[in-house]
């Protein structure tokens, strides 16, 4: 079963057929930052349009979101700082982010007539470079040394975690279990890759060594747990939980909440109450550089 959404392009904009059918006409998107210790929330942006998947800049001075196939910079006071490489980047989906040194932007683009493939571009300027010839490939993580990308890809009917040199080259399969493996992201020390997997029949959070060995399940509940993002101090992960079984999918417009796991004790706490979200809420890394805040998108009907 193809568990990643089928994507179409409309006037150069990328959106999944499933998400397109789920977005209400009166939708509002709210860009929020949350203090993980106090649970204080600040609304950065609230607009009557659909945007997704915030990243925090490595300097901490702006947030990066995708909307209508483009990438936009938003300051922490809600000011629109413009599109990122508007003449070079289009058809972007919600899998994008920055290298640890902040010098490289990585993004997944739904190429016309094809499916998602992964590109890089120097943040100071240049031309996008295609990294994955094969498709579909959905980027999620880059190693701390900047040398390796990890991503979810479908090859021969199986959705697994793959790795590839950031400069391009041979891709390496890291997982081989039945069912969808998705959302791979490196810890800040580079020792682990965190990901989510449907291998047990319910989506749960896992981690493995950077070479794919020692795969370990971390969550064991009746929620559907997606997109683990390790903190800068390597002590915790934040992830999104669907309250109901989504059968291996991560749809838009469902009851969800954000949760935090202490990796030393394995204790889990809720960071938010239940809200309307899912696809687009926190698909990619969104920790602030100091590890005190996370960014996410809450939707309103």
Language model features by range: what are they?
Residues 278-301:
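Blade-level signature of beta-propeller repeat domains, shared across WD40, Kelch, NHL, RCC1
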Residues 55, 97, 141-143, 185, ...:
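Conserved beta-strand position repeated across blades of beta-propeller domains
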Residues 58-59, 100-101, 144-145, 188-189, ...:
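Residue-level detector of Asp-centered blade-edge/turn motifs that repeat once per structural unit
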Residues 90-95, 99, 103, 109-144:
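Asp-box/WD-like beta-propeller blade repeats and closely related beta-sheet repeat scaffolds
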